[in-house]
């Protein structure tokens, strides 16, 4: 039997923020028809319990036994009234259920449901949700109330539910129900935050297990009414820090049909991540469940105005190009002020609908895998005191250089935040460098570190910081021994899965390290790496900017050290002090494979500073370690993703043009000309672009084929047919 996710999904929530009951005055058949034919969606969310002030998530827009109706819906059942029309036009109907925001009055009626902080106060008392309201605990009797609501929702004939929450908030939960459950498991009281206490780490696991257990039982409530029913929630994205709200996408994926996370565009000071939608989608895809990337098309917190057309399209095309589905927050109120503001989205979704078969049943073609580790996000706190020193920004203005105070941060919570910020930059840095250089790569997760999974790749990247178990390290070692290649940097793999130091001979040896003597004095600026030979696009004696943090280590025998650190300088505008004998890069042949190790956090440095020499190092190292199946000659702002269509054998190559006007939000996308793509594949007989269906002119030399794309505007798909 076909499933909801067998075809690409174009989800939308059509909202009435000022008055939810306006839906009962609509012509429901015309509304469903408009959404299908004009908006081109095939899956809609409809509000079952609103997320509205002052926390009215306990009120329903439909008849539900034992539940109070939302004002305006006393004589109107929104779900039972609308579902026949949605299904008539081929739209699957999912119900939005608010599970995190409740009024103080409702909480007073259920005094043992609220989440309690370590200080003994309800979370909502200290941190009112959206300025007014509180939240409930997944281990309290509220869970049974929630499951009854889900069952009542599914009885209406809808196709599934989306749960907006629950959320286990920071410093929660210390309620009596959590205390009892924790004590049953660990025979101890719940500790307060203390990163040196192993029991605190158990509490982090307990919170995530509690969230997963709630979702498991919620799924049972859905399928108990409709075995084909769908359930999912906001699973959290790739950014470190998800432990604060007990969100770990892979753990939750076991009990939901989709993995969804938000990639909303918000204007803010500073640099925006150009690949926000792409990173979110690839991360969610790694959970093993269909990815859904969510965005609204309003101008950030200005909900009554539209995002620029270019940003709308960029979000959609990055998500689709990376193999994901899309969710869009739609609303009547924006259209009333600007009826044409949504036209770019209509055009884009119409294009996707017209070419639906091209985006179906795709398996990524990837030579490289990069680890995004939730273990690291949870537990990594470096043992290096140098990471916690205030170095300032290094900026020079008005004859003053900002060199910071030089003081070392002692507070462990602040240290944890620093390490999360560094890890965020590492992920963004490696991802950006790979995408800009058209490397075909997957994100993989901790659970994927097995020889069976890794054997599908030529190169594995451990970005700067990685907390790994002995078993995971042994699998990586086997991967390299049997011919795989490893890129590792800084403290990758030097901590176990709970963040405890693991500077063992086995781990250091794989990286080519004999011993770590310490770290260079941290400094922002005026410290360098020097090339010892012509390699990776550098000439001998070329200088490369050294990041603030770098390790002083000794290499084992029979390794190559083509780049060395220069001796450190105390401040800027000083003469160079010669070359140290500490390697900056180690190349270690191990079994039939090879390891390239950077003794500095290259991903973090490129992610934060965008200095081109470090992008060059990453680019050339990947080429040095493996031969790409697909080669692309295009500007770095063109993102390329490749797939094999399982049902047809076709090769599908998607190109996303991120070439904008050097500011965000983007207001124009500049067309790119003369893109060349080559690959080794003698099974391809022909090809075309879906923009015009005109046949490609393919040249062949042996098994290698090459073709050109004359002009790329915002998005293009190449379809290569098999013989």
Model-derived segments and their meaning:
Residues 79, 95, 99-156, 173, ...:
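Active-site-adjacent "subsite" loops/lids of carbohydrate-active enzymes
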Residues 650-657:
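Short, well-ordered beta-strand segments enriched in hydrophobic/aromatic residues
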Residues 2-7, 13-16, 34-42, 47-50, ...:
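Hydrophobic targeting/anchoring helices
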Residues 466-542, 568, 602, 608, ...:
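A glycine-rich, often tryptophan-bearing local segment used as a flexible ligand/cofactor-contacting loop or short
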Residues 31-81, 101-130, 170-182, 244-258, ...:
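Aromatic-lined carbohydrate-binding/catalytic grooves of carbohydrate-active enzymes
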Residues 18-38, 61-91, 144-145, 210-214, ...:
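Aromatic- and glycine-enriched glycan-recognition loops and surfaces
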Residues 24-28, 46, 56, 415-503, ...:
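Helical hinge/lid and interdomain linker segments adjacent to catalytic or ligand-binding clefts
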Residues 549-551, 661-683:
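Surface-exposed beta-strand/loop patches in extracellular or lumenal glycoproteins
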């Amino acid at each position: 039997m076909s499933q909801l996710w067998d075809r690409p999904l174009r989800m939308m929530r059509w909202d009435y923020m000022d008055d939810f009951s306006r839906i009962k005055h609509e012509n429901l058949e015309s509304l469903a028809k408009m959404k299908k034919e004009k908006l081109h969606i095939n899956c809609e969310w409809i509000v079952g319990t609103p997320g509205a002030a002052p926390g009215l998530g306990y009120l329903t827009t439909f008849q539900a036994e034992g539940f109070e109706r939302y004002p305006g819906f006393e004589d109107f059942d929104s779900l039972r009234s609308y579902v026949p029309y949605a299904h008539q036009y081929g739209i699957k109907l999912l119900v939005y259920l608010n599970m995190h925001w409740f009024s103080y009055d409702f909480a007073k009626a259920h005094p043992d449901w609220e989440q309690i902080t370590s200080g003994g106060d309800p979370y909502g008392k200290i941190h009112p949700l959206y300025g007014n309201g509180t939240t409930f605990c997944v281990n309290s009797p509220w869970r049974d109330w929630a499951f009854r609501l889900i069952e009542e929702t599914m009885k209406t004939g809808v196709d599934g539910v989306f749960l907006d929450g629950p959320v286990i908030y920071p410093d929660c939960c210390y309620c009596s129900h959590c205390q009892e459950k924790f004590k049953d498991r660990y025979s101890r009281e719940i500790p307060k935050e203390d990163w040196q206490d192993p029991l605190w780490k158990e509490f982090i696991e307990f919170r995530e297990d509690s969230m997963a257990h709630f979702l498991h039982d919620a799924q049972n409530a859905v399928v108990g009414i409709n075995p084909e029913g769908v359930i999912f929630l906001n699973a959290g994205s790739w950014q470190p820090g998800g432990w604060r709200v007990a969100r770990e996408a892979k753990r939750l994926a076991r009990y939901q049909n989709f993995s969804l996370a938000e990639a909303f565009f918000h204007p803010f000071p500073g640099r925006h991540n150009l690949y926000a939608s792409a990173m979110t989608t690839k991360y969610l895809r790694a959970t093993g469940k269909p990815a859904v990337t969510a965005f609204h098309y309003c101008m950030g917190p200005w909900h009554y105005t539209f995002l620029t057309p270019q940003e709308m399209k960029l979000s959609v095309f990055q998500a689709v190009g990376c193999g994901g589905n899309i969710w869009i927050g739609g609303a009547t109120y924006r259209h009333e002020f600007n009826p044409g503001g949504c036209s770019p989205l209509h055009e884009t979704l119409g294009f996707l609908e017209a070419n639906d078969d091209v985006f179906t049943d795709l398996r990524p073609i990837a030579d490289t895998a990069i680890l995004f580790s939730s273990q690291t996000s949870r537990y990594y706190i470096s043992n290096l005191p140098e990471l916690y020193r205030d170095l300032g920004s290094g900026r020079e203005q008005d004859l003053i250089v900002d060199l910071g105070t030089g003081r070392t941060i002692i507070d462990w919570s602040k240290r944890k935040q620093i390490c999360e910020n560094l890890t965020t930059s590492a992920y963004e840095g490696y991802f950006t460098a790979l995408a800009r250089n058209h490397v075909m790569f997957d994100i993989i997760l901790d659970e994927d570190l097995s020889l069976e999974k890794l054997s599908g790749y030529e190169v594995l990247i451990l970005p700067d910081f990685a907390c790994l178990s002995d078993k995971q390290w042994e699998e990586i070692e086997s991967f390299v021994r049997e011919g795989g290649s490893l890129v590792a940097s800084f403290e990758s793999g030097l901590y176990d899965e709970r963040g405890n130091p693991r500077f063992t001979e086995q781990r250091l040896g794989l990286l080519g390290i004999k011993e770590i003597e310490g770290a260079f004095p941290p400094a922002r600026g005026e410290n360098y790496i020097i090339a010892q030979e012509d390699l990776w696009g550098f000439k001998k004696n070329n200088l490369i900017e050294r990041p603030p943090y770098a390790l002083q280590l000794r290499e084992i025998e029979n390794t190559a050290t083509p780049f060395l650190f220069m001796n450190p300088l105390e401040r800027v505008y000083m003469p160079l002090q010669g070359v140290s004998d500490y390697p900056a890069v180690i190349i270690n042949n191990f079994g039939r494979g090879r390891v390239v190790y950077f003794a500095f956090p290259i991903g973090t440095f490129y992610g934060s500073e965008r200095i081109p020499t470090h992008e060059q190092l990453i680019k050339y190292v990947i080429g040095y370690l493996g031969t790409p199946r697909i080669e692309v000659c295009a500007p770095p702002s063109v993102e390329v993703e490749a797939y094999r269509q399982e049902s047809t054998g076709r090769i599908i190559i998607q190109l996303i043009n991120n070439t904008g006007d050097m500011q965000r939000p983007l207001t124009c996308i500049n067309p790119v000309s003369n893109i060349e793509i080559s690959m080794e594949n003698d099974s391809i007989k022909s090809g075309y672009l879906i923009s015009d269906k005109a046949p490609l002119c393919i040249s062949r030399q042996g098994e290698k084929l090459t073709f050109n794309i004359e002009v790329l505007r915002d998005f293009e798909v190449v379809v290569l047919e098999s013989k």
